[in-house]
């Protein structure tokens, strides 16, 4: 078993009690190993970013953490509770929330109704979007203001720009008040003009609201301004883990990603 190349200052996760702990996590399908022997801990309030080329296993690892896939090896703990074989909805109740590379929004539904539906699901309410008495109005308005979408409440998802859609996905996620946010390529499809505002929103959720964030992203300039640590995935394994400065300057990482732009 080969440990990842650890760089920079070590995380104090083990001392403080991690929000997330992975121990020897692996996932194989049809004889092919997709994720192999990944071990790490994430402390509360930390921002850990995952980088690596397409096919490195980053999204597959997120699927294992969120419960969309179940590992074939290893162990997962969320906030001290074992979640290795638990389904996604149990992990969500434990505080793990997830966004995806591909949007799952309904084009004809309004921005406000997306958030309202999420609030009803999170609070155990019935799915009656158009009833006269709506106990979620204040909550919906508050979440939309936090994510910069208050002025777009009545617009449909299909009318939004890519950046606004990513903000709406974050708004839907925030309704559940997740302690651990897994963001899978939130900048995908977002225009260069919209990247700074979306980056600032994610920074606010992390630093001002104190949320723990795991993020997969290919925009290195974005990650270098957000992440406390970088995790480098390579052929399904955790190649390196450390501060952004140490990881991007490391010869092992540079050799593995020669031509990948690191």
Label every PLM stretch briefly.
Residues 51-53:
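The feature captures the beta-strand-to-loop junction immediately N-terminal to the Walker
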Residues 66:
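Helix-to-loop junction immediately C-terminal to a conserved catalytic motif
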Residues 84-85, 143-159, 164:
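Conserved ABC nucleotide-binding domain
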Residues 128-152, 200-204, 212:
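Conserved ABC ATPase "signature" region
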Residues 181-185:
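Catalytic Walker B motif of ABC-type/P-loop ATPase nucleotide-binding domains
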């Amino acid at each position: 078993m080969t440990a990842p190349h650890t760089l920079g200052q070590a995380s104090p996760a083990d001392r403080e009690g991690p929000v997330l702990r992975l121990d020897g996590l692996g996932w194989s399908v049809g004889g092919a190993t997709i994720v192999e022997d990944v071990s790490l801990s994430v402390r509360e309030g930390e921002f850990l970013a995952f980088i690596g080329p397409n096919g490195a296993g980053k999204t597959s690892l997120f699927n294992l953490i969120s419960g969309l896939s179940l590992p074939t090896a290893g162990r997962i703990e969320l906030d001290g509770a074992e979640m290795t074989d638990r389904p996604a909805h149990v992990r969500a109740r434990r505080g793990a929330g997830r966004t995806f590379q591909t949007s799952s929004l309904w084009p004809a539904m309004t921005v406000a109704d997306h958030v309202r539906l999420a609030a009803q699901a999170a609070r155990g309410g019935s799915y009656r979007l158009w009833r006269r008495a709506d106990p979620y109005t204040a909550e919906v308005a508050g979440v939309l203001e936090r994510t910069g979408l208050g002025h777009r409440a009545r617009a449909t998802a299909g009318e939004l720009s890519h950046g606004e859609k990513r903000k709406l996905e974050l708004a839907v996620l925030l309704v559940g008040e997740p302690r651990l946010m897994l963001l899978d390529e939130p900048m995908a499809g977002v225009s260069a003009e919209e990247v700074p505002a979306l980056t600032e929103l994610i920074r606010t959720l992390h630093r001002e609201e104190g949320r723990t964030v795991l993020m997969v992203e290919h925009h290195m300039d974005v990650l270098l301004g957000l992440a406390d640590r970088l995790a480098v995935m390579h052929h399904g394994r955790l190649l390196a883990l450390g501060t952004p400065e140490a990881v991007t300057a490391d010869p092992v990482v540079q050799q593995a990603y020669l031509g990948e732009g690191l």
